[in-house]
């Protein structure tokens, strides 16, 4: 499954009171996603593995407010590794105020195959771009 989304992100500094008022107002216009809906407390677990190079290009571009930047990450939604049936490959690119996010769900087994063998069993446009960006910037999974 492939998901593509373009949006504008504007960020504002809010007081606690403004935040809670805004959050309450938004509830009238939003629906819970399947993860929140199935969760007993209305919250769910998200684990992200970011890709960057050894100079921390992505991290530094974010800190410096670079207007054109890219973020590559792998996400899963279960605390225990063996409970994850899939992971989400996410490519997030910023062009000024415009944010473009491409995402593709792949099985955990297929992602582990890629990690162990250096290539994918199959390809789609998100996987192709994931490979291209990682090669261009020498990205690899980064933990700190």
Report each predicted region and the residues it spans.
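Phosphate-end processing signature that detects enzymes handling 5′-triphosphorylated RNA
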Residues: 1-144
